Amino acid sequence: MRRSQRVRKPTLSNDYVVYLGECDFDIGKVVDPISFDQAIDGPQSSKWVEAMEDEMLSMKHNDVWELVELPNGFKPIGCKWVFKTKKDSKGNIKRFKARLVAKGFTKKEGIDYHDTFSPLSSKDSFRIIMALVAQFDLELHQMDVKTAFLNGNLGEEIYMQQPEGFQMKGKEHMVCKLNKSIYGLKQASRQWCLKYDETVTSLGFIENKIDQCIYLKISGSKFIFLILYVDDVLLASSDLNLLHETKQHLSKTFDMKDLGEASFVLGIEIHTNRSRGTLGLSQNAYIDRVLKRFDIQSCKPGDVPIVKGDVLSKDKCPKNEVERKCMKKVPYASAIGSLMYAQVCTRPDIAFPVNVLGRFLADPGMEHWIAAKKVMRYLQRTKNFMLTYRRVDLLEVIGYSDSDYAGSPDDKKSTSGYVFMLGGGAISWKSVKQTLVASSTMQAEFVACYGAATQAIWLRNFISGLKVIDSISRPVKIFCDNRAAVFFSKNNKTSSGSKHIDIKYLSVRDMVRKGDIIIEHINTEAMIADPLTKGVRHVVFKCHAESMGILSSFDVLG
């Protein structure tokens, strides 16, 4: 059957892929113009015109295109101006940014583009590097690559219409033949990453094989890490001269903006106290904006994000059209998405309630909305808390794995939770409902160990590539509070209660046998992953949150 060559129209008029720094965490009221006409007719027109002129200068500086007559057989793609106000950690506007974006969704795979994959650094990698900054008292600086995607070379022959408002006088009929990649093209991100990799490896940096956005350079007893997140570059170095030397080399190839010491990255505030040997990651300003958006800032602060005994189920979903219509007015999905970003970045203490609330996105009820507001009231009390790392005598990765039993009232499935610690703070965590119905607490705990074990292997492989944590050569220790699960992980014996366990979970035994991990028993009172699987008493929750490194700013900074 012949494949259709018809190009599907986008669902929305501005269905473009755009990488702007605040897109992940800026949840304030949308005031940015959505069209060229809105920008030039609005109260900030002079700012937006200046921003567009800066963008056009970047296009000229990078030799992104040349004006030509459109060849026969080619159809030019359109382009659109995208406007964004960049904000600081307090939400104040610091820059007006205009980005020229190609309508890449109209291009055909295999004709106009081929490979599109580009790596993206994980939050786990970022937190591990932050723990190392605290441990080794590293210099931590930040740089921004201006118009990063324009640095990528383009192999395909692509023509684009001239930008709105900037058509060349007397040559309005001509089109732009693209020499470089441009925002909006399917291959733009990949081409930028390839160019960046080519540049930094020529400077002697080695790419981490597990997270391809992390680079290491060792020069004698000195070392430096580079962390790339789209167009943001973090530099963590044991030597200030090596750091400045690297900055100079990068600035020779790319148009860079030196932001000095890192203090605000991807909506995360970085606070250091070098005399105390501590580093804290905070989302205070972000949480403030979340609370204001959902009108929670004046509510009574809560002690815990979910109370022990709280049950959230499908029984609390709307029962009729009247209730369903009422819930359509509630911004439930937006609230859960906002909480999810805080949870993923710096707040493992809300991982369990956010995971549970996310199960009802399709049809939430009023009880679910009340539970979501309870999480926000807890954040109201703890918004100035930080995920903290500190200098320790023995730097090693320690894991904790836990599970409840049949905690989901709808399908009787259990919830797994794990947290890995390094330098006194959590570097990796997860709370997730299991995909099977466990027949015993041992099986539920062993399945949870499987999730923790696979993450331990990832952490071990990644950290091995950093070459600064000697203890990673030893098996990663994972604590479990179920003796039967610990025994089962170390023995090949089966019983009537374990013979039906899926073979993939039995790979835990192989990891133990090969010396990649070791699973040891710990008392339930010391299981800090407990709040990732169920609601617990306030005193217990507070103790475990502190053990995960969730501390007040006063405790971190003094």
Model feature map: region roles:
Residues 1-198, 202-209, 214, 556:
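Chromodomain-type histone methyl-lysine reader module
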Residues 6, 36, 52-55, 59, ...:
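Mobile genetic element proteins and their domesticated derivatives, centered on retroelements
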Residues 86-87, 150-162, 186-187, 217-254, ...:
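Catalytic palm subdomain of template-directed nucleic-acid polymerases
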Residues 99, 103-105, 339, 400-441:
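RNase H-like nuclease fold core
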Residues 124, 130, 182, 187, ...:
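C-terminal reverse transcriptase regions that engage the nucleic-acid substrate
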Residues 144-147, 177-185, 207-237, 250, ...:
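Catalytic palm active-site di-aspartate
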Residues 195-230, 234, 243, 253-262, ...:
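Active-site palm subdomain of RNA-directed nucleic acid polymerases
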Residues 264, 269, 396, 426, ...:
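RNase H-like nuclease module associated with reverse transcription
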